[in-house]
Amino acid sequence: MASTTFSSAFSILSLPSSSPSPPPWAPRTLPVANRRRRAAAVASTVTESPKVLELGDAIAGLTLEEARNLVDHLQERLCVSAASFPPAAAGLRAAAVEEAPVEQTEFDVVIEEVPSSARIATIKIVRALTNLALKEAKDLIEGLPKKLKEAVSKDEAEEAKKQLEGVGAKVSIA
């Protein structure tokens, strides 16, 4: 049965190219000007043999029934199936998943500036938040801007910011 469908599917391919008009059962095609533009666009990007172009035009002119028969025949002849190929939409869905914005779960608390009148109070808060020694907390305050805490939760970062801004420090969460 496949050979009969194959012969009917390729009957359009065996038509002489010099026929003045297509048979009445042939599908409607694009106007000649559009085909020429399309062929020129293809020819400008890839150099193809006239045989390939003729075959491509013939396949493009197939009806849906003939195209389905052609696919069935080629699958049988080449021993492949449509199931052996991954679906094209899977790649699009994967790209859409990658583009989804990732919500930040870890934050850094950065001390931007400490006024000189609030240095002692800020050092006390820094020591309470980080368990640093007095000298290390003082060194942290002197070389600003510096990260006070890294990779903490949003609640913990907001709480540290609130305490530091309460004593007069300028703090940002990154």
Curated annotation (Swiss-Prot):
Record-linked InterPro entries: Ribosomal_bL12 (IPR000206), Ribosomal_bL12_C (IPR013823), Ribosomal_bL12_C/ClpS-like (IPR014719), Ribosomal_bL12_oligo (IPR008932), Ribosomal_bL12_oligo_N_sf (IPR036235)
Presequence positions on this chain: 1-45
Family per record: Belongs to the bacterial ribosomal protein bL12 family.
Recorded name of the encoding gene: RPL12-2
A Gene Ontology term for the protein's cellular component: ribonucleoprotein complex
Originating species: Secale cereale (Rye)
Pfam families: Ribosomal_L12, Ribosomal_L12_N
Stored HAMAP family: Ribosomal_bL12 (MF_00368)
The keyword Transferase belongs to this UniProt entry's keyword annotation: no
Main location: plastid
GO biological process terms held by the UniProt record: translation
Protein name according to UniProt: Large ribosomal subunit protein bL12cy
Lineage: Eukaryota, Viridiplantae, Streptophyta, Embryophyta, Tracheophyta
Any one GO molecular function term: structural constituent of ribosome
